[in-house]
UniProtKB/Swiss-Prot annotation:
Site (Histone H4K20me2 binding): 93
Name of the protein described by the UniProt record: Origin recognition complex subunit 1
Organism ancestry: Eukaryota, Metazoa, Chordata, Craniata, Vertebrata
This protein's domain notes: The BAH domain mediates binding to dimethylated histone H4 'Lys-20' (H4K20me2), which is enriched at replication origins.
Sequence positions that bind Mg(2+): 599-600
Subunit structure: Component of ORC, a complex composed of at least 6 subunits: ORC1, ORC2, ORC3, ORC4, ORC5 and ORC6. ORC is regulated in a cell-cycle dependent manner. It is sequentially assembled at the exit from anaphase of mitosis and disassembled as cells enter S phase. Interacts with CDC6 and KAT7/HBO1. Interacts with LRWD1 predominantly during the G1 phase and with less affinity during mitosis, when phosphorylated.
Region (Disordered): 195-218, 242-301, 392-456
Amino acid sequence: MPSYLTRQKTRQTFSWVGRPLPNRKQFQQMYREICMKINDGSEIHIKVGQFVLIQGEDNKKPYVAKLIELFQNGAEVPPKKCARVQWFVRFLEIPVSKRHLLGRSPPAQEIFWYDCSDWDNKINVETIIGPVQVVALAPEEVIPVDQKSEETLFVKLSWNKKDFAPLPPEVLAALREQEDSPEWQKPLKAKIKNVKSPARNTTEQEVKGIKSNHSTSKFHQTPANIVIPNAKKSLELDGLGFTRKPNTRWSKKSSCDSLDYQKTSKRRAAFSETTSPPKKPNKPREIKPSSALETRVKNGQTQPFCAKSSVVLRARNPAMTTTKLGVDNTLSPIRNGLRSSVVPSGGLTPVYIRRKAKEQETHKEPIRTSRVHRKSSLLTLKRIRQQLCLLDGDDRDQEEEESVDSESEEEDEFISSLPTRNSLGQSRTRQTPSKSPQKNPKPRTPHRATPQIRDRNLAVQEPASALEEARLRLHVSAVPDSLPCREQEFQDIYSFVESKLLDGTGGCMYISGVPGTGKTATVHEVIRCLQQAAETDDVPPFQYVEVNGMKLTEPHQVYVQILKKLTGQKATANHAAELLAKQFCGQGSQKETTVLLVDELDLLWTHKQDVMYNLFDWPTHKGAHLIVLTIANTMDLPERIMMNRVSSRLGLTRMSFQPYSHSQLKQILVSRLRNLRAFEDDAIQLVARKVAALSGDARRCLDICRRATEICELSHLRGDSLSLVTVAHLMEAIDEMFSSSYITAIKNSSVVEQSFLRAIIAEFRRSGLEEATFQQIYSQHVALCRMEGLPYPTMSETMAVCSRLGSCRLLLVEPSRNDLLLRVRLNVSQNDVLFALKEE
């Protein structure tokens, strides 16, 4: 897309054109035209009915609208110049969740007629950037992609916040009638022409002059020190219009080898045309070819010149006449920015090549070219492949072109390092040209691979028993039909978000509660119900964005996640914060309300607390249309860790989720296991009371029940009869869930290992320290074994026991190279060790 006038940072002044049309009822003066003056002296006249660009949040993508009215509001002091417009929307302005409804990827020039009346169509005239051309197309017409249409916008469909639809017939007819009218097109072009900078016009004229004096292939081969915009990449060869320069020598024999499919007469005619010098302006100190040379060129003769007496003519301007044929570039020196015209060229035919040519003509052998001629043939093949690539548009030809480029560069390096003529004549070898073209191996990794989830080969197996069905229903990721025991909290959150959506304002709500009390699940259910209401037009449409502090590597990355989910853009944290601040703090009228859910808010705490401050400050701005729902585990988090300026912006709308009671946990389990007989009633009552007394965490209750079903299945495999989950199964599961893994490991350890742990505690109590050497612990271990009548192990066996307990992280030990003096510590508390070692 072109860069609009907003990027030039010019100052604009607006003035009315013509007499006003008074409107006494509304205290307004209507106008038909307005003049926009720029500080460089140019003027742009804009009339009612034209399409204009309006300043927006993104200077690169301004808003597009059609002027309906131009008026001056006399009720305000001072009077303001205003306009009433019909909005268009770009594809990037449509919510990300609705873009898939288009079914295709639109070009950047396509806009959509906004067919809704909820946006404010009254704007300030000073926000107008300038006129723009908009072309209306039928839905079946194709948008052109040529260079002339880059500054033109096209409209084919309309957008009504729900779906894309073709333009109404009356709208399409009016737009096309306006497009065909010369009143809107010619003045527009004339005015915009004055706005363009003279430097750009001069550059365009120079480019046109260059293109007229040179062929397209020469223009493409311009050196890198001259940058010309809009350079064409077309390449034609010989009869197609390719011209060569007089300083480039091409062997007629190499042309025969590379283009043997053409006729001899056509080849001679093409060669005579290519050797003719192009038209160039007269320059001082320019060397002109002799008449003998001109006669030879006209007759189509390509006799070799003598290296000592002949001089290759070169142009004075290397920027416009030098090609990429690397012989002259590598062998001719450069003095004071100009190539020397008296240095022999690398393209001169050596003596041994002429002798070889005479011998081949005598014996009528096939013509063999040297390395320089092979390079010429390679370059000729390269141009042929480029021409075929432009004509056919085949991607494989482009890959072959790259291989030829690399091969020609290797040839350039080889030629630049060639020895002198005498040494070259001595080391000359016969080389057989390769007949099969070189093929590039295809990369193993595809360039345009689309990541996707692997397809399932087999269907999902149905649960084979009631216990498997119960495990599926009791999983924390299973979505229930309803959320029991949270009806009041659901209604409060729903009413808060619904009121903000209907009023078009923003706000914050802080939700707190211990883990597993249904905070996130309740908010998800509220959003799901609101989205269903938005589809039936009960509430205005909105965008839903969710971020979780646990999934962020750094608190400032929350800006990146929000921007990516809102617009699909990727940016750094600082840039994303600026874009979001511009979006939520701007005065745009065509914004859709955004509902932002921030889970694990306490993990977004920073030293300056700027992340929390911005999240709570954005909804307070007028026109932000942002609703923030924050979730944390601490009830008094705002008072404990937040500054006053942060907690005051959070507001007083807070909600606390209390832990579940045993009756509520029982109701949750019964609702999940509805119409399924897998648990005894006493077992459900037991687990509900146990969990309610400890934490009230519903997730922990579901996990205990799932583990109990697994224990029940294992007992059936050992020979017991398959029955319902009993109290014994649940007690075993509760012991596993609430007991420490260290205690379980100590209980399942061997007798020698348990005796070694008792020796460690005995030594700690004797010395009064929580650290001892292996020698001290070993003496205590031997004494305990004698008291209990057990055979005490040797020093090596005790060292192996110590190492094994250290590998289990029950002990913290030094490396074994310290031997008897290595220090040992407990990695668990002494009370836990004594609790695990007590006899039941």
